[in-house]
UniProtKB/Swiss-Prot annotation:
One of its GO terms (cellular component) is cytoplasm. It holds the Pfam family KH_6. InterPro entries: Exosome_RNA_bind1/RRP40/RRP4 (IPR026699), KH_dom_type_1 (IPR004088), KH_dom_type_1_sf (IPR036612), NA-bd_OB-fold (IPR012340), Rrp4 (IPR023474), S1_domain (IPR003029). One of its GO terms (molecular function) is poly(A) binding. CDD domains: KH-I_Rrp4_prokar. Belongs to the RRP4 family. Non-catalytic component of the exosome, which is a complex involved in RNA degradation. Increases the RNA binding and the efficiency of RNA degradation. Confers strong poly(A) specificity to the exosome. It comes from Korarchaeum cryptofilum (strain OPF8). It is found in: Cytoplasm. This is Exosome complex component Rrp4. HAMAP family: Exosome_Rrp4. It comes from the Archaea.
């Protein structure tokens, strides 16, 4: 048998049927070998290369970053001039500390582990290099509030056409709400009652996003729950 020929990189996102490798490599989970001896992916997922084995980690419901995406992250580590951020993705975000950049509010980078931030994806190479930025106005540390989550694929339904659903949630619960592309939602309601109602509304949106008349059902839920 021939030597190994890798056609993908470790942690690269692949689609079903995509060729992964040929030669002396062991097929692992969620891959198959075609008639020509090429190992291919069975699912949408991340390539995992370990020793002489290649497998796929499925990405059902996972957030795959795109340039200019708005994300809500949690500071997980501070190493030298880089702040590492969990963005609810197989990829960890890196926030370079701009110590000498002009027109940058350096106080924004005064962060600690556990802080919640609103950031934008500045660049992503599709494999391992995911760079975030908080330099623009409105980005940076989120003070107080609560973090809720939905499937990233449901984010457009939470926002609605021309932000109609998001506006309804804000107005009905009198809450500050920020919805990010990675499915994290930061809310700052006036009381725990509104928080609970928002959780119920988001769950309903997530479960019934495929059914018509969703806005009317959410409006009814908000009215009923908030009038109690």
């Amino acid at each position: 048998m021939s030597e190994v020929t890798l056609l993908v990189r470790d942690k690269e996102v692949v689609i079903p049927g995509q060729p992964l490798a040929r030669g002396k490599v062991k097929p692992g989970k969620d891959v198959y070998v075609d008639e020509s001896g090429t190992i291919r992916s069975k699912k949408l997922g991340l390539v995992s290369l370990k020793d002489d084995e290649i497998s796929i980690v499925p990405l059902v419901g996972a957030y795959i970053p795109k340039e200019d995406d708005l994300v809500i992250g949690i500071v997980s580590k501070i190493s030298g001039n880089t702040i590492l951020v969990d963005i609810r993705s197989p990829y960890q975000g890196a926030l370079p500390i701009q110590r000498r950049a002009e027109r940058v509010d350096l106080k924004k980078y005064d962060l600690k582990i556990g802080d919640v931030i609103l950031a934008k994806v500045r660049s992503f190479d599709g494999a391992s290099s995911l760079i975030l930025t908080i330099d623009a106005e409105g980005l940076g540390k989120l003070e107080g509030g609560y973090l809720l989550e939905v499937d990233p694929a449901k984010v457009p339904r939470v926002i609605g056409k021309r932000q109609s659903m998001l506006s309804m949630l804000k107005e009905a619960t009198r809450s500050e709400i920020i919805v990010a592309n990675n499915g994290r939602i930061w809310v700052k309601p006036p009381s725990v009652k509104e928080l609970i109602v928002l959780e119920k509304a988001l769950k309903k949106i997530e479960e019934e996003s495929h059914v018509s008349g969703l806005s009317d059902r959410i409006s009814s839920l908000l009215s009923q729950e908030l009038s109690r």
